């Protein structure tokens, strides 16, 4: 599961050069099991994963968002036997690090403090969603995705946020969706249902590294929909 959604095992030079330059000649005094063999990964994959995680950990430590690392729950971030390394007795994953980096980038784009409603396109495993809701408990959150990701993130968030009301609304028609979408803390819908949303304006919409997987005509439809139903739109693209 982890290899499909959020574990990066193929590294190119341009993926790590800036991160290594930022660290420079740091001498580590941390307690870390850097040569751990990960379950479901080969020794080569484990070596790459462990070192990349440690590299990004050092970069994360220089950022303000680092102080929130321990707020992230292992219930979600280690829910599928995800690979991790122990650093100073903390379970550290690429998933946690990337979620914090994404959170900081979004918050720098437009502050979460004045947001009440969020729409996320292509939430995948739900890693970014979990971070955002962990730090902003009062948000109303809608996830728009396709199976199997839709159900993977649903299961994850249901396990992490047991006190929140969560609705699977993917099979509702236009009238039903508009009458029910405001009844839940977290709602799950399908892409075609974006056309159904009429009397709702999201404070912020986000799309993390998923737009490049869409067809050009679908990208045009997405941007048209977002311009109608959202005040802000943050997106990032992993590759051109």
Where do the language-model regions lie?
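A short, conserved alpha-helix within the catalytic core of class I
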Residues: 213-226
């Amino acid at each position: 599961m982890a290899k499909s959604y959020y574990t990066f095992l193929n590294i190119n030079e341009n993926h790590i050069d800036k991160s290594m330059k930022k660290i420079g000649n740091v001498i580590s005094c941390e307690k870390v099991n850097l040569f751990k063999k990960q379950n479901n990964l080969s020794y080569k994959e484990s070596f790459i994963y462990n070192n990349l995680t440690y590299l990004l950990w050092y970069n994360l430590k220089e950022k303000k968002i680092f102080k929130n690392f321990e707020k992230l729950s292992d219930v979600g971030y280690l829910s599928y036997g995800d690979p991790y390394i122990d650093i100073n007795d903390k379970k550290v994953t690429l998933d946690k690090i990337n979620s914090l980096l994404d959170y900081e980038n979004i918050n720098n784009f437009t502050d979460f403090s004045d947001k009440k409603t969020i729409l996320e396109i292509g939430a995948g495993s739900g890693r970014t969603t979990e971070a955002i809701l962990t730090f902003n408990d009062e948000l109303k959150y809608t996830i728009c995705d396709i199976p199997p990701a839709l159900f993977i993130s649903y299961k994850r968030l249901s396990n992490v946020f047991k006190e929140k009301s969560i609705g699977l609304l993917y099979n509702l028609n236009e009238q039903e969706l508009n009458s029910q979408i405001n009844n839940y803390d977290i709602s799950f819908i399908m892409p075609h249902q974006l056309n159904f949303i009429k009397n709702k304006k999201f404070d912020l919409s986000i799309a993390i590294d998923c737009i490049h997987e869409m067809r050009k005509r679908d990208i045009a439809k997405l941007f048209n929909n977002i311009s109608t139903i959202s005040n802000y739109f943050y997106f990032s693209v992993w590759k051109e």
